[in-house]
């Protein structure tokens, strides 16, 4: 029980802090493209932080990271990066916190039951989010009623289901690979906008999606297969 409580507190606090930093950053500067790119920088930070924990990635993994970052840039940054603003630092801190959350899940998920860890994590997030809302905002019942569906979807699907699957999936997965797979959210976001909201995808954005998907596939290809391809060529 103590280990489960500790795991839930650590993972939940990191998830709350990362989400709060992201939402505050977007509120200050509502550029979703830049927010998506900076937040997804955990794809690089996770293996970098992993070096300090004795996890040495091979060349295949690092090449995949570079390809993924290039793909994210093409997909998200349509008009260049622009100047660094205060909100950017918040979004970068969000990426750092999400990196720590992925590493924490990697550490705790093999030690405790995944579903119980998920419940503990979201209990902590709920308590800390409610406390922050009461301290820094003045929410009303009318606001909750008006935004009930988005709140329920974000709480149940985007948070509850998605992060439970993350915990279960990371039990036997390198956290660097997990971060690569999770950065596919940028791809699905773009594709969802195209399919459901009829938003146009430029050739640059499509190429960015292809690069990110290729990076995820490359990172998970067995080394033996790569050696065979190299010899055949």
Where are these regions (language model features)?
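Specific alpha-helical transmembrane segments that line the substrate/conduction pathway
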Residues: 23-55, 94, 175-194
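C-terminal-most transmembrane helix of multi-pass membrane proteins
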Residues: 147-149, 182-233
């Amino acid at each position: 029980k103590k280990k489960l409580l500790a795991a839930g507190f650590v993972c939940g606090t990191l998830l709350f802090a990362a989400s709060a930093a992201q939402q505050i950053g977007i509120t200050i500067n509502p550029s979703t493209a830049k927010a998506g790119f900076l937040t997804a920088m955990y794809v690089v930070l996770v293996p970098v932080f992993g070096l300090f924990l004795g996890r040495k990635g091979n060349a295949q993994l690092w090449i995949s990271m570079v390809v993924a970052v290039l793909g994210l840039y093409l997909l998200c940054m349509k008009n260049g990066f622009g100047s660094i603003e205060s909100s950017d630092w918040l979004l970068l801190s969000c990426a750092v916190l999400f990196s720590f959350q992925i590493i924490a899940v990697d550490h705790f998920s093999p030690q405790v039951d995944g579903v119980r860890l998920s419940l503990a994590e979201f209990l902590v997030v709920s308590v800390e989010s409610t406390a922050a809302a009461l301290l820094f905002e003045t929410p009303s019942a009318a606001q909750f009623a008006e935004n009930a569906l988005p709140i329920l979807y974000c709480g149940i699907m985007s948070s509850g289901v998605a992060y439970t699957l993350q915990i279960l999936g990371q039990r036997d997965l390198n956290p660097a690979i997990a971060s690569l797979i999770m950065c596919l959210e940028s791809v699905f976001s773009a594709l969802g906008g195209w399919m459901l909201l009829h938003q146009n995808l430029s050739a640059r954005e499509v190429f960015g999606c292809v690069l990110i998907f290729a990076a995820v596939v490359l990172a998970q290809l067995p080394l033996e297969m790569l050696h065979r391809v190299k010899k055949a060529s």
